[in-house]
Amino acid sequence: MKTSELARRDKFQFSMLLNDKRYRSYTFQFFALFILICAMAYLGKNLLENLAAAGLNISYSFLGEPSGYDINQRLIEYNSQSTHLRASIVGVLNTLLVAFLGCIAATFFGVTAGILRLSNNWIVAKLMMIYVEIFRNVPVLIWILIIHSVFLAFLPQPKAFRGENPEATMLWDAFAFTGRGFYIPKPVFNDGSLIVIFTFILSIIGVFAFRYYARQKLYSEGKLLETRWTSVGIFFIPTILIYFALGNPVTLEYPELKGFNFKGGIHARGSLISLWFALSIYTGAFIAEVVRAGIQSVDKGQSEAAGALGMRPNFIMNLVILPQALRVIVPPLISFYLNITKNSSLALAVGYMDITGTLGGITLNQTGRAIEAVLLLMLFYLVISLSISAIMNVYNRSIMLKERLICLEIIIRLFARK
């Protein structure tokens, strides 16, 4: 009798959509999604009707028309006769460049400041506190303008490098830091360069493979392999041998002062440098607080136990504290990376042409296709934001709680053998 009652109870009924907690949340989510789709369909229909009444229609054919404007900082070939589509691609690459470099630099600044803020040295800790409080409490746009103004005011112009007694000199005859930007050597790829690049990629893979092997060896046998110098050898030796064996297939083109400016090499304009530095140091102040909170979330007994076993402070921080703090640090770090990407849209304030300046600026004004341009901008930032979030969430799942067990296992195995 009880079995038949349970069977009737488990049999699906429509009333369970609201009364059963197993289905209630899905029901509400379905209705919310349905209402959202209906609202978007209504707004879209209303938009199309209004555009038709005004004699307008949504079309992306303007992307194939000549842009008619130049872009000073670009990673691919482009001129004023290129299409608006290519101009948009240049803007996309410029946005991705400053976002990628900004995430790396902000992480470095944030982790360094977060660790130093917990330093026993009173002066260092207070200096890091001042850095954090000043930079995170002033809008990023103001920092972009201040840093760009300082960049223009204090760095020499190219003419200062001219003459028998120049006011400024190049660093190692290869690097020039001017108010117009940084000039650095440019690699020139000749015959056989693909082999060198392929060897370099294999060397990187080899380093990760060796470190993975060393980690597995440590976990399974408790044997600690020397990884630092071995990794350096795997990284450099094969590439250097192939490079000289093929007769220097990759050379460098150095910047040279010709006329009123430098020619040759890679020119990173001042707008890119100032934007990148401002975004990095501003976001780094927020990351520093997250890193500090993550470190403080680890029980003090962990560091005390590691110190009692004779581990040095830098090893305690790198092998015990930080791996456990990552599970607290990484989730908010995702938001900071997204903020760097979206804050890069302020690039137009210093003349850096990102996607907002090309597609959302000049292209929009020239073609009058505001709706199409804004929709493309929204799609771009949505895709980039979701991609960053997905990648960081995968990494976050890979280090959740596991790292704590791994670190404890390493310590136990290492000192149990001694």
Question: Where would I find each of the regions flagged by the language model?
Answer:
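Transmembrane alpha-helices and adjacent helix-loop boundaries
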Residues: 2-418
